[in-house]
Amino acid sequence: MKRILLFVLTNVAVVAVLGIVASLLGVNRYLTASGLDLGSLLGFALVIGFGGAIISLLISKPMAKWTTGVRIISQPQNVDEAWIVETVRKLADTAGIGMPEVGIFDGAPNAFATGAFKNSALVAVSTGLLQGMTREEIEAVIGHEVAHVANGDMVTMALIQGVMNTFVVFLSRVIAFAIDGFLRKGDERSSGPGIGYMITTVVLDIVLGFAAAIVVAWFSRHREFRADAGAAKLMNRKQPMINALARLGGMTPGELPKSMAAMGIAGGIGKLFSTHPPIEERIAALQNAPL
């Protein structure tokens, strides 16, 4: 749950900052000057909602490097690092994408891919993964991450998050306007949004943001099945990915920051907020999927 919480808070924080800046610029007063202007509110919600998602996408790679302490392999220092870089290169070529940055981070078994663009992504694996898996299994995990990049999952999830952000911003302000109007009923001296509007907006942005995260996590779980199948296709065989998943099922997966959880190989523990399906479901789906 810690990973999911950070993922939600990162997105909510960006949207909240944009909302506060808009309030300071007088946008709320404009939207409610003569009753709630739903058309203008929808435009405002689209700008804030997709603005927050796009900003989160654009800063995803530097944020990943900072939060995980990943060490970029610019020049391999040993045989293992050289093998990792060459494996990423081979799989990226097969997938038809540009060579990603390659990195290693300390921690329990996990891996992730991130970045705003297919041809300038980052693929990183943990030291725990490298120590606990065979090279064939590691290659399958790397293939899973490369498949995320090739499938455009970072952009897809950002667009989904943008839609959900728009819903949150729009609905929270409609409800806040109604509550504020009820609280100030009969107060003809006041104009523009009151304190009730401000407080309700902030609270609902957070509450609805968590509800939206459940929807985003549901989409993420479906993308995981595609990435598993993508890894099998890149290697032209299913068994390495099946073996890697089975081994992960017997390990304690490492925690990733929530902002990148959907691009990791190991999932969270909460069913509603989990960005990854259960291991047994992923294995069964891969076994039944066409190669």
Swiss-Prot record:
Signal sequence, start to end: none
Assigned EC number: 3.4.24.-
GO molecular function annotations of the record: metalloendopeptidase activity; zinc ion binding
Recorded topology in the membrane: Multi-pass membrane protein
UniProt protein name: Protease HtpX homolog
Encoding gene (name): htpX
Family the entry assigns: Belongs to the peptidase M48B family.
Keyword Zinc: yes
Enzyme class, broadest EC rank: hydrolase
Keywords: Cell inner membrane, Cell membrane, Hydrolase, Membrane, Metal-binding, Metalloprotease, Protease, Transmembrane, Transmembrane helix, Zinc
Pfam families: Peptidase_M48
Free-text remark on how the cofactor is bound: Binds 1 zinc ion per subunit.
Primary location group: membrane
Compartments in which it is found: Cell inner membrane
Transmembrane portions of the chain: 4-24, 39-59, 159-179, 199-219
GO cellular component: plasma membrane
Cited InterPro entries: HtpX_protease (IPR050083), Pept_M48_protease_HtpX (IPR022919), Peptidase_M48 (IPR001915)
GO biological process: proteolysis
PANTHER family named among the record's database cross-references: PROTEASE HTPX
Residue numbers annotated as active site: 145
Named cofactor requirement(s): Zn(2+)
Protein residues bound to Zn(2+): 144, 148, 224
